[in-house]
């Protein structure tokens, strides 16, 4: 039976501000998942009062800067300048929960952000940073520890406190697993209900982890399993004597201890959520209730040893890459920088006009084009081999040590990721093969015999004649669809612009092929900026360098097909705009760290294909009256592209703004 909206709000308000009755859990989470109802001013005021009462700053009670008007303004994230509504709809409870989490984490800073009008943008950034599972676990653990520090009330020994696994489980039961909005809403429910929080695993968790790693069955550790454990830890030696009796006694002792540990096992200790959490020495001492002043006694050392073993076995601090928050971009910054980079790439299409406006300096244009061609080869191969492949394989480590067991764990997945690189290479091979099969064939080339290349195959050798901006005849050509053919009619001669029947489809095939290519480039740029701004910069540079000669070649090929300058420019620009579609798809989908890795793997295959199968043959097939000058320019571009990407790969961790 559907309750009236006013009655629903009244019941919700009673649950929020009632002091005598028991507060029911999950009321905000249920309201969010139902998509019905809203919070009025009275309900919000009671909610915020309860929230502020849970937080205590160093100088006493914290400022109540999170007002009702501020909360209602979160209901208009796209139009914050408009007057707030009288109620906060249920779908915006996610933003309210994120704002409350920021306030619980750092009340003073959040109040400054509210006064500066930055709360809405910081809420979006906070939700975006919790998207990946690793960031979710670490962020929630740190947040719960901050709540513990700011909470004046101390839980009793018998009280079971809320921890990270419980919040994730409640969010999964309510809707989507590991959704930041649902998890933070579940957290806000517990804050309002007066629950205590535990931001670190219990001591029993570390013992349970070791047993889970060694055996899936609830039994004692056997001698072979203990030997494997000691070998993994790098301790112990060869056993040259029979210790059967000793093993039997040890077996009995461990059985008794393990049965005792099973009695004290909790949900906190059995959850695998903590497996990827890297603990500091301060965290380990906090888990076992040890003060920094007193230090670790011999008795306490025996207690915390399982935590050290667990950290070694889980490789939480060695195999997991450290996330540098300063390198990550917020959602708004990803769209801004990604759009600017893609806009610069798309302007390459407009650059084709310079070929017409600077007809008298066509000699310089020819050599500039050849320099960019070699620079594109260097940038593409350099980005693929020096930056993208190490990132795809997880080799961009920020620690000084690389352990052998870490390399073994990466090995299997690395093979599949490298296979994705080959998949990207093969996909674009198939695309261009089918593209060439659909192209009309020139009758003159058919007379050359079965070994000749297709007549209008868009060969990559782009050689602009210094005399009248034409491409000269080449003995060899590759299959790149977005560069000029190797026929010799002059592009600017009006007599040669008569459309033959077999060329009518050529402009559209060129535009379609380039549109798909640019869409893939946009996906690569979007995934790169979703990772870090440094990866986005490197990928954008590589895409820009190879798009410049491509777009100029497209423009020349469209003119050769008989199109007017205006129409050729429009088609070239339209195909370039598909890069924005790929960019926004990659940014909007929110593929996460694992998805970004696979997209970058496929993009690596694309870069290698374009560089080695298209652009490198273009460099090798060019004939010029000044071969040594051309050789020098090719080397400058090739070595320059490699140098730029090498410096970026070596010193990217030292680059800060």
UniProtKB/Swiss-Prot annotation:
How does the record say this protein sits in the membrane? Answer: Multi-pass membrane protein
Tissue specificity remark:
Expressed in duodenum, jejunum, and ileum.
What are the boundaries of the signal sequence? Answer: 1-22
What chemistry does it catalyse, as a reaction equation? Zn(2+)(in) = Zn(2+)(out)
Q: Where is this motif: Essential for SLC39A4 endocytosis?
A: 462-464
Residues annotated to bind Zn(2+) 1: 517, 521, 546, 550
Q: Does the keyword Cell inner membrane apply?
A: no
- Which Gene Ontology molecular function entries are recorded, alphabetically? identical protein binding; metal ion binding; monoatomic cation:bicarbonate symporter activity; zinc ion binding; zinc ion sensor activity; zinc ion sequestering activity; zinc ion transmembrane transporter activity
Membrane-spanning residues: 336-356, 375-395, 418-438, 509-528, 537-563, 569-589, 598-618, 628-648
Cellular component terms, GO, for this chain's entry? Answer: apical plasma membrane; cytoplasmic vesicle; plasma membrane; recycling endosome membrane
Q: Where are the residues marked Essential role in Zn(2+) sensing as a site? A: 521
Residues the entry annotates as binding Zn(2+) 2: 518, 521, 547
User: Hey, which family's this protein in?
Assistant: Belongs to the ZIP transporter (TC 2.A.5) family.
Q: What is known of its domains?
A: The two metal binding sites M1 and M2 that are halfway through the membrane form a binuclear metal center. M1 is essential to Zn(2+) transport, while the other, M2 appears to have an auxiliary role presumably by acting as an additional transport site that can modulate the properties of the primary transport site. The binuclear metal center plays a key role in zinc sensing.
Name of the molecule in the record: Zinc transporter ZIP4
- The protein's organism comes out as Rattus norvegicus (Rat)
């Amino acid at each position: 039976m559907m309750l009236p909206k006013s009655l629903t709000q009244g019941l919700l308000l009673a649950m929020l501000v009632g002091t005598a009755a028991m507060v029911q859990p999950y009321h905000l989470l249920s309201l969010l998942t139902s998509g019905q109802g809203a919070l009025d001013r009275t309900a919000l005021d009671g909610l915020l009062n309860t929230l502020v009462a849970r937080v205590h700053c160093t100088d006493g009670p914290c400022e109540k800067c999170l007002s009702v008007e501020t909360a209602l303004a979160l209901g208009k994230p796209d139009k914050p300048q408009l007057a707030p509504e009288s109620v906060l709809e249920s779908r915006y409870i996610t933003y309210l929960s994120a704002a409350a989490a920021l306030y619980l984490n750092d009340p003073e800073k959040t109040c400054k952000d509210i006064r500066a009008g930055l709360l809405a943008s910081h809420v979006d950034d906070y939700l975006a940073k919790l998207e990946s599972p690793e960031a979710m676990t670490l962020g929630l653990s740190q947040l719960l520890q901050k709540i513990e520090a700011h909470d004046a009330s101390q839980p009793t020994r018998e009280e079971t406190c809320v921890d990270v696994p419980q919040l994730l489980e409640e969010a999964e039961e309510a809707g989507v697993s590991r959704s930041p909005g649902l998890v933070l809403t579940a957290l806000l429910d517990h804050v309002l209900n007066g629950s205590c929080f535990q931001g670190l695993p219990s001591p029993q968790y570390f013992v349970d982890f070791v047993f889970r790693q060694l055996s899936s069955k609830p039994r004692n550790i056997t001698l072979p399993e203990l030997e494997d454990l000691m070998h993994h830890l790098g301790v112990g030696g060869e056993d040259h004597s029979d210790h059967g009796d000793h093993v039997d006694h040890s077996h009995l002792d461990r059985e008794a201890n393990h049965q005792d540990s099973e009695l004290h096992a909790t949900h906190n200790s059995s959850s695998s959520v903590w497996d990827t959490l890297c603990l500091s020495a301060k965290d380990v001492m906090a888990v076992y209730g040890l003060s920094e002043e007193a230090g670790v006694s011999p008795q306490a050392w025996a207690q915390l040893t399982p935590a050290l073993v667990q950290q070694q076995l889980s490789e939480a601090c060695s195999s997991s890459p450290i996330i540098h928050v300063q390198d990550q971009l917020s959602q708004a910054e990803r769209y801004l920088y990604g759009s600017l980079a893609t806009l610069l790439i798309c302007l390459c299409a407009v650059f084709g006009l310079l070929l017409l406006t600077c007809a008298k300096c066509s000699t310089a244009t020819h050599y500039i084009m050849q320099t960019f061609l070699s620079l594109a080869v260097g940038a593409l191969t350099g980005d693929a081999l020096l930056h993208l492949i190490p990132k795809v394989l997880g080799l961009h480590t920020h620690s000084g040590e690389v352990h052998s067991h870490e390399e073994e764990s990466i090995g299997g997945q690395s093979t599949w990721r490298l296979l994705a690189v080959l998949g990207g290479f093969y996909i674009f091979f198939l695309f261009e093969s089918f593209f060439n099969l659909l192209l009309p064939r020139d009758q003159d080339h058919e007379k050359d015999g079965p070994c000749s290349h297709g007549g209008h195959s868009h060969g990559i050798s782009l050689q602009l004649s210094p005399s009248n901006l034409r491409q000269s005849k080449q003995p060899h050509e590759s299959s790149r669809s977005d560069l000029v053919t190797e026929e010799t009619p002059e592009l600017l001669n009006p007599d040669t612009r008569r459309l033959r029947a077999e060329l009518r489809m050529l402009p559209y095939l060129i535009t379609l092929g380039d549109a798909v290519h640019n869409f893939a480039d946009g996906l690569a740029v979007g995934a790169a900026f979703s990772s870090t701004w440094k990866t986005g910069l490197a990928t954008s540079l590589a895409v820009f360098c190879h798009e410049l000669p491509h777009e100029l070649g497209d423009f020349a090929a469209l003119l050769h097909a008989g199109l007017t300058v205006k129409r050729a420019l429009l088609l070239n620009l339209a195909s370039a705009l598909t890069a924005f579609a790929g960019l926004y798809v990659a940014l909007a989908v929110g593929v996460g760290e694992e998805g970004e890795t696979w997209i970058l793997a496929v993009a690596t295959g694309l870069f290698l294909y374009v560089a080695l199968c298209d652009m490198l043959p273009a460099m090798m097939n060019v004939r010029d009256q000044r071969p040594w000058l051309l050789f020098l320019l090719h080397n400058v571009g090739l070595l320059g592209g490699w140098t730029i990407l090498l410096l970026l790969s070596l010193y990217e961790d030292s680059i800060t703004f």
